[in-house]
Structure formats: structure tokens, C-alpha cells
Amino acid sequence: MITGELKNKIDSLWDIFAAGGLVNPLDVIEQITYLMFIHDLDDSDNLRAKEAAMLGLPYQSIFADEIQVGERTIDGQQLKWSVFHDFPAGKMYSAMQEWVFPFIKTLHTDKNSAYSKYMDDAIFKLPTPLLLSKVVDSLDEIYRLMNESQAVDVRGDTYEYLLSKISQSGRNGQFRTPRHIIRMMVELMDPKADDVICDPACGTSGFLVSAGEYLKEHRKEEIFFDRQKKDHYMNHMFFGYDMDRTMLRIGA
């Protein structure tokens, strides 16, 4: 469970979007998801660089010295959250629109992947530099509280609380299945390493993510020490469908 202080910060983040003119709950959660992904991309790259350094192994950062974004070559460091979050509002907004967002849309090299397919028409919708600056500051506070938390899965709980905003609105019949119900259903199904798992109304892919986590916990050696089964897990096991393309982008 997340703390009252963290819930208040998340509620304040939604208020910031509303005050900035972005009130559609699906648009809000979509934009928050993009920004959290950009933040986590920086964190995971830093972690992998440290692990490689500890093991004395070479590491090629995704934020290379020079990165091609469209027809421009830019300094990859300026795509990192830890760098651009200190920019003035106007410069940060320009960097997000012109460099960072186009960069994340083309991250996956396989153009046939779900990520590439559904990110192809993704749009950065924050309308003003001031709104982006306030949202980035608010997310920094949320991440600070998550890092200070002693909860086992505080990030999952935080995103779960964010998604609850969609179910509260009840837009187009989109309602969230509670996570403990999802876990129970996955445990009852007890997926195997060679299964194909499909959710015909996947929404934000909660069932698929939970099934993936279950397999990593209960079939880890069977999957990750067998090249064929690992490829199946990474590329051919999970399928999600939804009538709402925004939900598919969030899920992907």
C-alpha cells in the first residue's frame, strides 16, 4: 500500500493536469506513462552502466554521445531526465517536443513489435512549457517518496493508484480489475513456459504483466536458461487486444 502523502502527491499531479487544460483521464494517464517511462529509462541506463563498471565489462549507453533524432544529430545526454529536468521551462519543452519524445518513439529496433506499432502515432499532448515544468517537478517528488518508501512494490502500487483514476471516471466502460484479483486468476491458471497468453480486452495490460511476473517467479530457470523458451517469452507469448488505441499504447 502507498502512503497518504504519496496519494496526495498523485492527486496533486492530476490537479496540475486539470489546471493546465488536460482533463481527459485517458490522455492524462497516457502522458504520465510516457514521462515515467522517460524517467525510468534514465534510471535503468545508469544502473546498467554501474553494474557493467563493477564487473569490468564494456557498456554502450542508449544515451550515446551523439544520437540521430530525425534529421538532427544531438548530444544524447540531453535526452536524460536527470539532465533536462533542470532546464528552464521553455528549453525543457523544446527538448521534449523536438528530441526526447521522438527519441522514445523510435527506441525499439524491430518495427513490427507492439511497441513500435502503437508508439508510431503517439503524441506529446502537454500544451505549455509551464505545465510540463510543473508535471516534471511533481513527478520528481513522487519518485522521491517512492524511493524513500519501505513497501515491497511501491512502484506497482503507485501506478495502480494512478490507474484507479480511470476506473473512477468510468469512461467508455473502462474499469480496473483489482490487482489481488488479477494475481488470484493468474495463480489459478498457473501458466507454463510454452503457453501463449491472450487478453482480448487488455486495457493497460494488467493481466499480461501479472502473468509475466508469475512466470519469472515460478518458471525462471526453465525460461531464461533455454534460448528457445526465452525467445518465446520475450517475443511470442503475450497478446493483448483492446478497442481503444490509447489503452494499447499504455499497455505496450
Please describe what each predicted stretch is:
Residues 172-252:
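Conserved S-adenosyl-L-methionine
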Residues 1-193:
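Non-catalytic, mostly N-terminal accessory regions of nucleic-acid modification and defense proteins
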